[in-house]
Amino acid sequence: MIVDCAHYVGGVRRHEGPLGIEEAASCARERAGFVWLGLHDPDPGELDEVGRAFGLHELAIEDARESHQRPKIEDYDGSFFVVMKTARYDDEREEVEFGEINLFLGPDFLIAVRHGIGSGLATARRQFEARPDLVRIGPAAAAWSIVDRVVDDYEPVAAGLENDITEVEDQVFAEAIGHDTTTQRIYFLKREVIEFHRAVQPLIAPLESLVAGTIIELDDAIVRFYRDVADHATRVDDQLNDQRDLLEGVLQANLSLIGLRQNEVVRSISAWAAIIAVPTFIASVYGMNFDDMPELGWG
């Protein structure tokens, strides 16, 4: 489904309403300005139509169709295919939801394909359109507005995970009694942190390559914006590494407390077994049928 499609010339949007795919491709071929096409969960036929209209590489189209790709940037004969993971923290369920954005970046176009939950791309477009200086730079600046939005949205997710980790840490050390349910929650949090790390970490190297100009030569005016995004992604990645280490420590502490609790139970059972063993032994001996027991006459 087309969410929005616009042709930008001279730093401004030329059309109020969204363009069709063929009309957008025709505008891109004019070599005046550029086209930004946004799609949300397109069907295979729609993606194929976009691919034909803009001359996109079939392998990139295949990746966009299947989704669930690792974050990456690939060069296809002068146009670039970018994969990013979107993330959103669900406060009610205390879970992280993931989606995906694929970008096709060419000299005269930017095509954004969103699968599942996504960042506020409509907001990113409005903010971009409010900056004619950025619009004049072209598709690379439009792509930055999306990448920046996606990475900005990582921060509240990391903060939500941080709160969950603090809660489970307080639960473990405040009660000083290990619980199997707590162990399950720690494992769940570890899995979410690892999955989030897999979304963030692979994005850092391509962003740094963009800044260094080894993938594509960017306008100097936009390089500093990409550098800021790369720094932001690195900070989030460092935070996730710290969270993973902290969760490992909390897990080991909880398992140790469970072990101590089990030892206490075993010692308690052993003590009661020893107490019960004495009268049981006496009763078992004197309950036997002996013809001669001399000690019964002592005293």
Language-model segments: which ranges?
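Hydrophobic alpha-helical transmembrane segments and their immediately adjacent juxtamembrane loops
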Residues: D231-G299
